[in-house]
Amino acid sequence: MGVDVKRFLVVMLLLRICEYAAASTFPLALRNCSDHCGNVSVPYPFGIGKGCYKNKWFEIVCKSSSDQQPILLLPRIRRAVTSFNLGDPFSISVYNKFYIQSPLKHSGCPNRDGYSSSSLNLKGSPFFISENNKFTAVGCNNKAFMNVTGLQIVGCETTCGNEIRSYKGANTSCVGYKCCQMTIPPLLQLQVFDATVEKLEPNKQGCQVAFLTQFTLSGSLFTPPELMEYSEYTTIELEWRLDLSYMTSKRVLCKGNTFFEDSYQCSCHNGYEGNPYIPGGCQDIDECRDPHLNKCGKRKCVNVLGSYRCEKTWPAILSGTLSSGLLLLIFGMWLLCKANRKRKVAKQKRKFFQRNGGLLLQQQTSFLHGSVNRTKVFSSNDLENATDRFNASRILGQGGQGTVYKGMLEDGMIVAVKKSKALKEENLEEFINEIILLSQINHRNVVKILGCCLETEVPILVYEFIPNRNLFDHLHNPSEDFPMSWEVRLCIACEVADALSYLHSAVSIPIYHRDVKSTNILLDEKHRAKVSDFGISRSVAIDDTHLTTIVQGTIGYVDPEYLQSNHFTGKSDVYSFGVLLIELLTGEKPVSLLRRQEVRMLGAYFLEAMRNDRLHEILDARIKEECDREEVLAVAKLARRCLSLNSEHRPTMRDVFIELDRMQSKRKGTQSQAQNGEEHAHIQIAMPESMSLSYSSPNIVVENSSFSLDTKPLMPHKTQ
């Protein structure tokens, strides 16, 4: 058993010695002084022999022993030295540590009764106990304390109970099972140490051991606690301090000690190695002698005092020049390609602008001399930024004419951006005329067009944004936030009639919408109706009575007479409005496969109910109870007149508006504005004098679709 203990101590000493036994070329001791005692290097301020140490506290006595390995003694503290910390020459490490033997404190150990003292007193010396040491207790039933001048500053307990033994790592580390370790509180710089051991349970016998050591007893350094009662010594790490303020130089770095005045701990600066306590003891490290000491790689290493530098060789310089030139060439080509791509994009935008009638728009707006609102022309970049590059998440709706996106302009204004699908070149002139005409319309119930963009392949229109969905959604997908009462429906019908009447008769050039339906009636934040989507709307010369165009519109709303004759008149919009009135009355969709084939169209379904006096049966259940029956009957009769197969028997939009306005005014207890003769102001839409409108008369073309008759519109064109 004693042999095993000796082997353990030898292993610990060899580990400490090997850590700092690397061969060094710098002087450790003063000139003509021995720097070794056996295999242990002895650095200054320690020394062997008179005149070789700083003062008496650092005197080393090299004493021969029977096992042929000399013992290093510090006579002033009566302790044996095991090794010195020579520091790391390649980092600023403080060069002020050494290691001594210290006896263990035993209690209740029959084999070690003669070794019961573990006290250490360093008062008056330049030495103090390093905070790297750990207070250690070994044995069963042990309660140990570290004492400093009568005060217990650290303690721990050990037991052999099964509850701790089952803990993972209990047999290979000091966690309380037969062994425990505690760190010393930092910054104390203790010079006095003693240990006290007690029994946890007085009635139980056992051997208790306590000591101070710089080793952490775990892993490969773990010693079974049973062996520690046979141990005599362990090693303690000590540090020293000296008044060396005069030593600081470019090669030596000394830092003051917080607790001891005029006390310093020194080290060599980075790039130097040696003993900082010897004048001239820090010498330059030649980093170029070993590739591992520098980072020059293939470059030439040149040693300088305290450091090194890397110089490029001619091949390296040539390689670097070629690499830099290649990078500059690549960067230049990238800039050239970027500029060329930018030039192509700008050229393409100019091409689209001219092809889409941009020059014509500029020419026509110049004729107006600022007498009317000019059409704002947006750049493609403006609208890309406004719509986040036409992100799919910004889509408000899609239809036969194109896709509508929600956007925000630079000034914070929210707009609706309509990206059309296609436009024929022969219709561009008429398209520009329509933009100018529609941009001058200013009516509270008409969605205002704010401008356009002609730099894209297909022109883009910008409208005011209407936030509160369309009438179709409110009728067929109702929400509790906005109930569609009869009063609201009558108000919406009156507002839509007002807008269409304005377009038909209150402007100098009548405009036919040609696609009146509930999805094209938007509701703003105040639930005011706004007529939108003029994608297929057309203006007509004041002396003309109709347009002759390709048949377009939405099934369920299209005038049957228009389908047969290709002639679109203001009465065709009246027919579509009549279907809209029925939609408001019944809450039914304009086309439904759930109805019989002959009444799938809402108009036919309504007329059949009127003939059979079943109007009350088809009314929307949401308005049956609260509506005024006389008002409902009056609106139903007005809708029947609007659906007359002979357009001459239909009322004009002006007549429809007067009738609805009278009903609404009567409901509010006021006199109708229309009855009082307060007509719409006749708005003069300015057009260039050189422009007149005429229309071609193509054959009927109807799309093969069960729900839509959307086709490309025939635009009015300039006469020669």
From Swiss-Prot:
Any one of the GO CC terms: membrane
Topology versus the membrane: Single-pass type I membrane protein
Pfam families (alphabetical): GUB_WAK_bind (PF13947), PK_Tyr_Ser-Thr (PF07714), WAK (PF08488)
Protein name (database record): Wall-associated receptor kinase-like 8
SMART domains: S_TKc
Domain of life: Eukaryota
Annotated S-S bridges: C254-C266, C288-C301, C296-C310
PANTHER family: WALL-ASSOCIATED RECEPTOR KINASE-LIKE 21 (PTHR27005), WALL-ASSOCIATED RECEPTOR KINASE-LIKE 8 (PTHR27005:SF280)
Function per UniProt: Serine/threonine-protein kinase that may function as a signaling receptor of extracellular matrix component.
Keywords, comma-separated and alphabetical: ATP-binding, Disulfide bond, Glycoprotein, Kinase, Membrane, Nucleotide-binding, Phosphoprotein, Serine/threonine-protein kinase, Signal, Transferase, Transmembrane, Transmembrane helix
Glycosylation sites noted in the Swiss-Prot or TrEMBL record: N32, N39, N147, N171
Species: Arabidopsis thaliana
